Amino acid sequence: MTRTYVISGAASGIGAATAARLREEGQRVIGIDLTGTEVEADLSHPAGRAEAAHAATELAGGRIDAVIACAGISAPIAKTTAINYFGVVELLEALLPALRASDAPRAAVVSSMASLQPVSALLVDAALAGDEPRALALGDELASDPSTGFRNYSSSKRALSRWVRRASVSEAWAGSGVPLNAVAPGTDVTAMTRDLLATPEGAAHVDAAVPMPLNHHQPPASIAALLVWLTSPANTHMAGQTIYCDGGADAVLRGDDVWSWADSPEA
């Protein structure tokens, strides 16, 4: 049976690769991006998110089987959080009623391996509290210093992965039968990274931060395949996970013990 997918960031990169794969499988895709997609909208502000959700729901006839949120930027500016966090969360929440109309609703978002890098705890907390003005103000402060501007990106992705973990087990999502998960790529070769990887110096800088011992840099298709499975009817029980599809970067950086936490119970 043909399913209807809504994909943000569908004009390029992981979003385009995912849309192409789904269309090859005979699925219906409603893309959202600034230009060149079925729905053209700017997800950096609340009005654009609301417009995108309304237009996608209308095109889908009120029933959406899966939402895949790929839209994002990596610039060291506050707008990164507006798009990467609020542009994802508000879009998903606005599309939830249409997802509930599906017999097998699914949702997935694109986080990043950068979620493991240094962040601004204040910005992450502001995002999770839904305080966009404060989050953007904190982002502007980070952007004013070249040594901290990058934390706009890592903080936006950390907040997104934490939101997925919280929301996935809530009555709104789990209670509605909607598996919600995230995928965290390593260094994906897209328009976002191509210029940086084009020089030996740039590539060395990236590889030092994101070591990928398995197959090195990855094509968008490697993430698309995972997103397609996560949002298929075959995924009945995976929820709240950020899956690091990153060539082993997470395993290199965090090592073999990711089960230790401050209040872990004693055996």
Label each region the model flagged.
Residues 184-195, 199, 204:
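Short, flexible catalytic-loop segment of classical short-chain dehydrogenase/reductase
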Residues 90, 152-154, 158-161, 182, ...:
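C-terminal helical subdomain
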Residues 72-73, 77, 100-176, 187-188:
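Catalytic loop of short-chain dehydrogenase/reductase
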Residues 55-69, 74-79, 103-105, 179:
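A glycine-rich helix->loop->beta "capping" turn
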Residues 1-30:
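Canonical Rossmann dinucleotide-binding motif of NAD(H)/NADP(H)-dependent dehydrogenases/reductases
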Residues 32-49:
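Rossmann-fold cofactor-recognition segment
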Residues 68, 108-110, 180-183, 193, ...:
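Hydrophobic structural elements of the Rossmann-like NAD(P)H-binding subdomain
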